[in-house]
Amino acid sequence: MRDLKEYDYSALLLNLTTSSLNKAQRRWRFAYAAIYSMRAMLSLVKEIVPARIDPKTSDASLSLSYTALESGEGAKINSMPLSYVPAIDQEQLVEIMKGKDLPGIQALGGVEGVAASLRTNPTKGIHGNEQEVSRRRDLFGSNTYHKPPPKGLLFFVYEAFKDLTILILLVCAIFSLGFGIKEHGIKEGWYEGGSIFVAVFLVIVVSALSNFRQERQFDKLSKISNNIKVEVLRDSRRQHISIFDVVVGDVVFLKIGDQIPADGLFLEGHSLQVDESSMTGESDHLEVDHKDNPFLFSGTKIVDGFAQMLVVSVGMSTTWGQTMSSINQDSSERTPLQVRLDTLTSTIGKIGLTVAALVLVVLLVRYFTGNTEKEGKREYNGSKTPVDTVVNSVVRIVAAAVTIVVVAIPEGLPLAVTLTLAYSMKRMMSDQAMVRKLSACETMGSATVICTDKTGTLTLNEMKVTKFWLGQESIHEDSTKMISPDVLDLLYQGTGLNTTGSVCVSDSGSTPEFSGSPTEKALLSWTVLNLGMDMESVKQKHEVLRVETFSSAKKRSGVLVRRKSDNTVHVHWKGAAEMVLAMCSHYYTSTGSVDLMDSTAKSRIQAIIQGMAASSLRCIAFAHKIASNDSVLEEDGLTLMGIVGLKDPCRPGVSKAVETCKLAGVTIKMITGDNVFTAKAIAFECGILDHNDKDEEDAVVEGVQFRNYTDEERMQKVDKIRVMARSSPSDKLLMVKCLRLKGHVVAVTGDGTNDAPALKEADIGLSMGIQGTEVAKESSDIVILDDNFASVATVLKWGRCVYNNIQKFIQFQLTVNVAALVINFIAAISAGEVPLTAVQLLWVNLIMDTLGALALATERPTNELLKRKPVGRTEALITNVMWRNLLVQSLYQIAVLLILQFKGMSIFSVRKEVKDTLIFNTFVLCQVFNEFNAREMEKKNVFKGLHRNRLFIGIIAITIVLQVIMVEFLKKFADTVRLNGWQWGTCIALASLSWPIGFFTKFIPVSETPFLSYFKNPRSLFKGSRSPSLKKP
């Protein structure tokens, strides 16, 4: 670089200040100095900028946002960030990515040239400070997609407004308002029509607000479920960040099962294969490498291998971005239970429509035959009655009939499901479970079998090497120095090169940081801290030729390396001890000698493995061989280097959770890749197996044994199996299929890519949030955020709570429907009028549908729910217990209201208006008291745990206050009159009798045979086969 001293400004500046120059000369000298300085600076820039973006420059010059300065102490990295404009055309790079233009990449200097232009150091990543990340986000955009705007409140108002019954009521309100004003004047004539308007408006607003709120809730949960974690390299450290925080220039680590978070280029890795079917539709897996195909695209998934990727496009600049931006995720997913309730709503609505039609016909006939009176006079006197009066009366009759339909249709049922699901999903998040599919909430309550993994679910997944055997000799921590240097060097190779983990050693020389899977971290920690491995040195001395990543089918991983010092090629295998042992013909001793693996030696080593496994240790073996060629990983004739035992303790509370599931009638089956001895030890520790079990031999099988059964044997033995060891994902899938064929509702936990088929096949797929791959999560219904089996038990409890809450509301609402329909129908037939006006019925509909749903759908789960047996696939949605409760309460309400209708005036010595108000008030208060009964369908104490549900208490209080306002202050609006204290006391007393009636009702025994099966053709929706609701599409 040109020396700055070459540009000497001192003489120039001195000449500018000399007194001999006149004013004009000084101005010319200043102009010359300015031009000269600019030329000098441009010359410097031309030399400095290429030096900074040259891909062949040193690490210091590649340090993107930092300036390398020379000082007396040598080159140092300045900590001050440097604003820069990328030395690359971003739009051109996006087009190159979209077209997979390899010559275009090469023209930019290859992947390394692109990295240099983006100021990325491939070995250190970008700088992780907020200023640097924000600058890159401003320059290249954020890793988010522009979604179509969510549905607003007006959309839901419009949806509610489109309801046919609402439209008919509005038409009736318009006619009623017009004729009322014409007949009685605007001061008195607007009340009836205006009241219907206000009531309809309230129904629309409340319905729209409820749906809008739930839409927002589901959108929020959807954003959370899309916020996956990505591992990146920043400031030389591997760290996990949100996918939304990935920026251009980031170095991203990819492994099997990961979803690629942005468009990028392959930096380094091995055996990388990508599934691009989500983007191209092609099912074939594509191999990605540095030379021929370095292109990696957002949204695609890694199916094999591992790699590091340089991010070059994010968000809307990615190939997938434009496609995703046009997709609006539908949060209005209909669950199977909602579909069943829609059918139930439709059927009850038809019954209500029939009753309303009969009421309409009867009232019209009675009116036009002169059998109705108003203020003691006949309403219709043929041609003497004004047309306006006739039309107004007909409109009033039609409005009453339509309102009966409104009350009869249990529109609150789907709302109750939505409220319950939204409430449960929100609460389950705090209980470490994220729901991805709504149907899983209700289905989980019916689970009869849970197939669970061991590692990380039943155990802590915090591995630590506690045993090490070299050949037939146990090596303790204090005796590792006795290991031969040659064997030690091979162990360094076997752990340091055959791994997907990494070791980060800071400049300060503090304790190294280990990253990777728990197993990899444990092995690296043991090799570095106990055996003294320098991982960076090991990597520099060897060249990795080929890698075979860990496979759950083979249960091992391998690497082919060339030692640079002597150019020899070595094969290293690592994996399940008995699998690796089967590949060995010799073994190393601590002195470095190699002994023959005869039958006696193999038996002794197998006994060592079984002994460690019986102590709940996970056994990993290392084997080595000098290879004859550099293209194939040989799998036989290896030499066993050593066996380590990793301790992974059970999670606290797992045994209690297992016991809870057993009491709930749910069978736990542990499916693991560990050997049978380790699996049994953990199963006993967790309580899955009991030492008193007589059928212990049938309870434990190996995967190969299970898959080799005949179909008949599998179906016969599958119920008895509690533990399946050395299993593959295909064995897990096979077990799930067998269990479902036997009628079980199956929940399955999984974390690997290969678990995806089993997760999809199961009725409920539960993926692990920490160790789970993105492929597994996408295949699942619920993500267990803490990977803890205790959270699985909590999900089971929530599932039962959802189903139970919906049944409570069905019982409550059908009671109101039956009572309202019968009382209006009988009164219309016999007296020619309906005791409850359109506005009053709309008010009942409002408190019943919305407030009732809120009160009953938000009950929290109790431990009592887990003392019941699971709900069967074919069990009726409306049980005999529910029929008993709702029929008794309905009959009581009908009896009370009919007595008030026909004898109320004489019993209480009141006029008709007071009697009608008593009927309306008593009917509403009956629903308030019956809400308490609905809290418990079988238990006699309906007040237990009431203090924990403040929302229920609040809604009851609000309902009572609003009812008082309706009766006492909105007389014109609600067509009521004021009641005195004695009359209020009578209404409360009559309504409160529903409590003792509900208490004694629960002593009435019920048959186990479904109630409607006694009829010749029971409606299928009530009997309700649950198979469609549980079977995956």
UniProtKB/Swiss-Prot annotation:
Its EC number is 7.2.2.10. Mg(2+) binds at residues 751, 755. It catalyses: Ca(2+)(in) + ATP + H2O = Ca(2+)(out) + ADP + phosphate + H(+). Activated by calmodulin. Gene3D superfamilies: Calcium-transporting ATPase, cytoplasmic domain N (3.40.1110.10), Calcium-transporting ATPase, cytoplasmic transduction domain A (2.70.150.10), Calcium-transporting ATPase, transmembrane domain (1.20.1110.10), HAD superfamily/HAD-like (3.40.50.1000). GO terms for molecular function: ATP binding; ATP hydrolysis activity; calmodulin binding; metal ion binding; P-type calcium transporter activity. It is found in: Membrane. Residues 25-36 are annotated as: Interaction with calmodulin. Pfam families: Cation_ATPase, Cation_ATPase_C, Cation_ATPase_N, E1-E2_ATPase, Hydrolase. CDD domains: P-type_ATPase_Ca_PMCA-like. Residues 1-152, 213-341, 416-806, 858-877, 931-948, 1003-1006 are cytoplasmic. Belongs to the cation transport ATPase (P-type) (TC 3.A.3) family. Type IIB subfamily. The N-terminus contains an autoinhibitory calmodulin-binding domain, which binds calmodulin in a calcium-dependent fashion. This is Calcium-transporting ATPase 12, plasma membrane-type. The gene is ACA12.
